[in-house]
């Protein structure tokens, strides 16, 4: 049961990390240097 809970939390935090990274990368006013990495 503990392994299941750990795996669930890992997936949740993984998607949250991707969502936050994508949000910051798509915000030129907050991170203008991200444009160079997207190309």
From Swiss-Prot:
UniProt keyword list: Membrane, Photosynthesis, Photosystem II, Reaction center, Thylakoid, Transmembrane, Transmembrane helix
Keyword Aminoacyl-tRNA synthetase part of the UniProt annotation: no
Primary location: membrane
A Gene Ontology BP annotation from the UniProt entry: photosynthesis
Name by which UniProt lists this protein: Photosystem II reaction center protein I
Pfam families, per the entry: PsbI
Localization terms from the record: Cellular thylakoid membrane
Domain of life: Bacteria
Signal peptide range in chain numbering: none
Keyword Membrane carried by entry: yes
């Amino acid at each position: 049961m503990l392994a299941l809970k750990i795996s669930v939390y890992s997936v949740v935090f993984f998607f949250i990390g991707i969502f936050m990274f994508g949000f910051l990368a798509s915000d030129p006013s907050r991170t203008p240097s991200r444009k160079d990495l997207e190309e």
